[in-house]
């Protein structure tokens, strides 16, 4: 039997490893790799092994939800809690080189073993021809799927670490020391290789899944083309395109890993990829989700728009939700829904099936637009009437707000007169929550989040650290059970890795960067805004913005700012925020020494509760843009270079 060695630094000393080192993931305890390809069934299981390394996009343990400022969690925490692992260490500036958190290079501390994944993909591609009597079209599809996975796993590593070794083939155990001690490759070469794999994969992937219910999550042409678009956008973005911070970052032969010269053609190439992906998605029947009330609903137009936003993510019936291009079934949403749901009423306080701990900070709440569809700091009404200056002061809800805020109750001025996506994404003290057993706009749950109230702080670990909750992630058909310690019936849904709104906004971004403002740029932003109940970009700023900002959509810089904010709003709470701010090279500006804020949740009365408190002050320097490689890996492979600053 031929033996294999992955091209990975950490294995550089393991020259005498036996073949059994490589069989840990072979299905059904098959004795050898070759035996995994003696029948269609065992080969298919090996295909699914290649899929099994897919990162769990809905997991707060494996993702970037709390590394930056998308969510806060209680800190310090009680012992033996279930959400106090690596991401929290990174978010508070405690990443290290001895044992890095979220280590996808080695598959440790919350990270999956991506290089092992690439090795298994290579094994599959080399051995699949040995499967007897395998249908030719099925074999082509399987090969295309594995090439897609191979591209995606490379992309995941590239996005995290910058330059990486390219695992094009597995080396035999007889490989020399020099062959095994691989080098990181320039980032442009890495992007080119990933795109070439995606191009190869596309030809033999299906446009639609033949069996949606049993094949959900498997690669298709729309998925591959959408990933290609995102890869090329990443390559064109400031972190990788003309980044002078890494001017002196070179390999041992003096070859630079980054080209310090900005290349506008990368944006043009990304725009073409986005256009192609959108055309494919259109032909495959994808469209922006819009909620259709059912017979049990009693809701008005604004709540219907809210449900369109919420269900664009949380709808689990993909015959209804045609917006999700790629849904990851490797990790369903049940756990993150549990962490997002507040205690809706006093009768549920003994129910431990929900945890109310994922808390968007004040920084995120302020990001959403006013009801006019412009930033609150640029809204002429907010500025001229003093609403922005006094946004933390109390205001009493009148009947005008009765479907979003409990009439007669007080909350911060900040929570009034906001766009629908604000109320669809976030919940807060005295906010109304539609669904989870209540489907009448006149009888919604009232969130009461002050100390001593159902959704207020209790204990060391079960509370919102900021006073905000994440409404969008909780399916509205969930059901909390009274008097049942674990009684939370959750309607699970596959996590939406890519949805159509994401692609539309990417296309707008690439067009603006490549060519500047145009009707085509506005078109794709406005489609997303229209679904959110907002006027188009140009009219919104001309009608509602302060005089100095009315022409903002007319300039490339102004429109860039609008598109970036639109992406952060539309994709809020879905795990994109950290990666987006990073690729724009805005992380130092937005996070370094800028406090993460929330309400004073220790208070039982409205006045002191709505005092702004600092949760913590993150430190983000240039070195934090890329993950460190573990020191041990560098010691066994002298050809590897550590990322700058670590």
Placement of each model-derived feature along the sequence:
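Short coil/linker segments at helix-helix boundaries
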Residues: 164-184, 239-269
């Amino acid at each position: 039997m031929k033996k294999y060695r992955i091209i990975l630094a950490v294995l550089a000393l393991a020259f005498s490893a036996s073949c059994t080192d490589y069989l840990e993931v072979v299905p059904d305890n098959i004795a050898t790799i070759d035996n995994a390809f003696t029948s269609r069934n065992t080969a298919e299981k090996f295909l699914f092994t290649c899929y099994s390394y897919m990162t769990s996009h809905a997991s707060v343990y494996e993702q970037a939800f709390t590394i930056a400022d998308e969510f806060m969690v209680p800190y310090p925490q009680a012992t033996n809690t279930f959400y106090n692992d690596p991401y929290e260490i990174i978010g508070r500036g405690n990443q290290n080189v001895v044992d890095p958190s979220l280590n996808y290079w080695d598959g440790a501390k919350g990270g999956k073993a991506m290089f092992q994944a690439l090795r298994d993909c290579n094994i599959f591609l080399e051995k699949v021809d040995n499967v007897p009597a395998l249908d030719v079209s099925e074999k082509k599809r399987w090969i295309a799927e594995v090439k897609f996975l191979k591209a995606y796993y490379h992309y995941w590593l590239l996005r995290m670490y910058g330059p990486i070794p390219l695992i094009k083939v597995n080396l035999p155990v007889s490989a020399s020391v020099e062959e095994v001690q691989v080098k990181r490759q320039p980032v442009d070469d890495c992007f080119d290789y990933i795109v070439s794999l995606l191009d190869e994969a596309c030809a033999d992937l299906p446009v639609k899944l033949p069996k949606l219910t049993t094949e959900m999550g498997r690669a298709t042409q729309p998925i591959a083309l959408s990933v290609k678009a995102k890869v090329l956008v990443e390559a064109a973005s400031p972190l990788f395109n003309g980044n002078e911070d890494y001017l002196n970052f070179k390999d041992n032969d003096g070859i630079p890993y980054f080209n310090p010269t900005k290349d506008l053609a990368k944006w043009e190439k990304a725009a073409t990829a986005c256009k192609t992906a959108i055309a494919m998605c259109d032909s495959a029947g994808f469209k922006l989700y819009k909620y259709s009330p059912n017979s049990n609903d009693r809701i008005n137009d604004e709540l219907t728009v809210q449900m369109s936003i919420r269900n664009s993510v949380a709808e689990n019936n993909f015959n209804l939700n045609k917006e999700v291009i790629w849904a990851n079934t490797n990790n369903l949403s049940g756990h993150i829904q549990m962490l997002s749901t507040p205690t809706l009423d006093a009768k549920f306080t003994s129910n431990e099936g929900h945890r109310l701990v994922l808390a968007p900070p004040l920084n995120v709440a302020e990001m959403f637009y006013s009801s006019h569809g412009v930033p609150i700091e640029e809204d002429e009404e907010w500025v001229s009437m003093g609403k922005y200056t006094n946004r933390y002061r109390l205001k009493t809800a009148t009947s005008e707000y009765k479907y979003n805020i409990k009439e007669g109750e007080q909350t911060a001025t900040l929570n009034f007169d906001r766009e629908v996506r604000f109320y669809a994404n976030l919940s807060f003290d005295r906010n109304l929550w539609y669904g989870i057993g209540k489907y009448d706009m006149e009888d919604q749950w009232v969130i009461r989040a002050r100390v001593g109230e159902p959704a207020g702080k209790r204990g060391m670990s079960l509370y919102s650290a900021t006073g905000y909750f994440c409404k969008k992630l909780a399916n509205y058909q969930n059901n909390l059970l009274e008097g049942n310690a674990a009684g939370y019936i959750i309607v699970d849904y596959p996590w939406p890795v890519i949805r159509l709104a994401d692609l539309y906004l990417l296309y707008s971004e690439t067009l603006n960067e490549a060519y500047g403002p145009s009707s085509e740029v506005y078109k794709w932003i406005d489609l997303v805004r229209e679904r959110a109940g907002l006027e188009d970009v140009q009219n919104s700023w001309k009608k509602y913005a302060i005089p100095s900002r009315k022409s903002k959509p007319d300039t490339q810089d102004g429109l860039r700012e609008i598109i970036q904010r639109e992406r952060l709003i539309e994709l809020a709470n879905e795990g994109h925020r950290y990666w987006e701010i990073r690729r724009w090279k805005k992380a130092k500006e937005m996070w370094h020494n800028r406090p993460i804020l929330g309400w004073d949740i220790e208070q039982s009365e409205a006045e002191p509760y709505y005092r702004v408190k600092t949760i913590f002050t993150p430190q983000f320097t240039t070195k934090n843009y890329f993950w460190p490689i573990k020191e041990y890996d560098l010691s066994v492979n002298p050809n590897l270079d550590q990322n700058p600053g670590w």
